[in-house]
Each structure stands twice: as C-alpha cells, then as structure tokens.
C-alpha cells in the first residue's frame, strides 16, 4: 500500500487531504505531513489539527527530513513551493499528485520534464464529476461547437487568487482541442465597453468571486433557438481531496510519466 504524505497539511485543503487519506487508506494512512518552515505548528499531530484525533503523524517543516517516510506526495501548494517540492521528489524518486493551479506554460513544461523520471498525476481538478464533465464537453463541442457560441462561467470563494480557475481553463482546453482550435488565440477573458459583435470562433470566460463558494462551473453552448448548459457544482473540498487520494493510490506500480485524472478514471 502506498505511503502518503501531504504538503501544506495545516491549510484548509491540507487538513481536508489528511482526513481523506485516513478515510480511504486506513491500513497505511498518512505517514508524513509537511508545513512551511518556521510554522508554530511544527510538531503538532496532523490528525488533531484536522479534528480527527491523534494519528501519530507529527507536522514537519522540512520535506527532506521525512523523505524515507512516504512514497507519494500530494501537493496543492502555490506554484513556487510546488516546483521546489517537484525538484526534490524527482531527485528522490518519489511519486507526486499535484493539484496546484495558476501554472504558466513554462512551469507546466517543468512538470512534463519531471514526468520523464517519476510518475506524476497533475490535474486542475480532482473531482470525478468535473472530469466526467470534461468528457461531456468534448462530445458537446464536437457536435455543437461550430454552430454555438461557447462561454465558460466560474464562481469561487473570495480567497481564490488565480482567475480564471484552473478548472475553467482546463474546460476551455478540452473544448478547443475538440474543435481543433488554439485556446491561447480564441480565449476572451471578460468583456467591457463597446466590444462589438461576438467573434464566432471565440471561447469566452467570466469569473465571479465571493463568499465561501467552493467551486461552480457552467459551460454554455448557445445557438439559434436553443442552448445547452453543462454545470458542475462542488459543495465540499472533500470532493477534490478524495479524488487526489484516489490518484495517489492509482500511482502504485506506475511507470514514470505525466498523467491526469482521465488516466486515473479511464476516461480516454
């Protein structure tokens, strides 16, 4: 059974990941939990911090110090932190599950390079429902795409720092790929003022931030006389955490490579 470590274990998503690991993989469970260096929480029990009771795993402020205690690292931290962890895991031969969003093209290329040496699952969203939605969007785009105007609307809590969301961008990529378009050339991010008529082949993005919304995504295919909406709404971060743990367990015995949740769920 895979020994799992969680990076950023003191954060909102990190604590949810700790809980998800304990629920899904109690036999081996969480074997390491890492927080930022200098944190006042170093030494605390990860289970107690996640309101689970003691699980015997103390928070560490140094990934290298716990290198012998895990096989796969789940990392949802910010890009700069994640890339440092990626470099370490690549050198140490550790698998990774990465849910970091807001990556640049160059940073994604670093993931691809690391995937030559270690197995990595990278996804903008680990929800089973979202990844099924990507499959549906591919189908809808192939059937309706040339006849419909396509808009992607996403809503998240006030604390989210990147926009559009990684999930919205992944949805846009799925649609653009199905239509043979380059998303970087057809994406329109928000509109203001006298924009003129809508260009036919564009894919629009609208972003809403407020409250404690975990994540809502709607893709609109609007044509003459009808419209199709494909919507996914997440009500709990546990949805993403369970998917990440599923990916971590799936990586056992996998060859080096850069995988995504479509591989984990066999949705290709």
Curated annotation (Swiss-Prot):
Binding site for NAD(+): 8-13, 99-101, 123-126
GO function terms (MF aspect): 4-hydroxy-tetrahydrodipicolinate reductase; NAD binding; NADP binding; oxidoreductase activity, acting on CH or CH2 groups, NAD or NADP as acceptor
Reactions catalysed: (S)-2,3,4,5-tetrahydrodipicolinate + NAD(+) + H2O = (2S,4S)-4-hydroxy-2,3,4,5-tetrahydrodipicolinate + NADH + H(+); (S)-2,3,4,5-tetrahydrodipicolinate + NADP(+) + H2O = (2S,4S)-4-hydroxy-2,3,4,5-tetrahydrodipicolinate + NADPH + H(+)
Keyword Transferase: no
One CC-aspect GO term: cytosol
Entry binding sites for (S)-2,3,4,5-tetrahydrodipicolinate: 157, 166-167
Top-level taxon of the source organism: Bacteria
Chain sites annotated for binding NADP(+): 36
Protein name: 4-hydroxy-tetrahydrodipicolinate reductase
Organism of derivation: Pseudomonas fluorescens (strain SBW25)
Gene: dapB
